[in-house]
Structures are given as C-alpha cells and as structure tokens.
Amino acid sequence: AGGHLAQFLGVTAGVSEFEGDGGNAGQSSAVTCVVNVYGPSDFTKSYGKSVDAAEVLPLFLGGNLETQRFRHLLSSPLYWVTPRAAPTLCIHGTEDKYVAHEQAVWLVEKMKASGAEADLLTLPGAGHGFKGKDAETAEAALMAFFDKRLKK
C-alpha cells in the first residue's frame, strides 16, 4: 500500500475530489517528490502473478474489476498522470510476484510521455522486498534521489 499511496499523492495534488475537508484548506497537498518502491500503478491490468491480488483488491476497492471498474480506475495512479506530477523514482524487482514489474514500467513511460520527471531502477531477479545487494542498491538510489530534491 505504501508505494501506491505515495504515488497517488504524487499525481493527484490539486485534484478537488481528493482534497478533503480536514480543516487544512490553506495547506497544499502537493508532495515534492515520490519514491515508489514496488507499488502498483494500474489496478485494471496485470497486477501481479499472485492469487493474493485477486483476493485483496476487491476488499480494498469494494468489489472486483467487473463490478467496480470505476473504483479500480479512480484508484490507479497511472490514470492521474499529468505534466504536474511530482518527480518520481520507481524501484522494482523483475521477479516481484505480488506487483508485476511492468506496473512500474507503465507508470514511468506515461510520466515521461507527459513531460513529468520519472526514473525506474530495475533490480533484475529481485522480488517484493529487497535483501542484500538489492537492498543496498535501492537504498543508495533512494537516498540520492531524496538528497537531490529535498536538500537545500
């Protein structure tokens, strides 16, 4: 959920339907940048190779794709990409059985096509959750990305 929710914030800043009424109308909901670590971008397509996705998504979205297509679209960051999307780094392993690597590829391609800044760090052979050298590589990329965008 973390990668998906971070990415959703990165593409929906200023969209009135998502601003809410939490009493902070004077504060922007925009984020400076996003690191999406193996988060899904499109709930209407190949989510993963795991049976878990077919079981979990209906609980999260109130029904399966056939009965709640609108919610699946509405909840998918891929469909909210604009040139104003926050700069994004996606980090994803090619052997992720829960969220298919192509989810990151689709998002980065769409962001770049829109003119938004996006990069993809692909970790060959890595699954959902990084260990050892993959974890070190992901952490180094994440820290460099944040340092570039958040340090003044």
Label each region the model flagged:
Residues 1-152:
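Alpha/beta-hydrolase superfamily serine-hydrolase fold, recognizing
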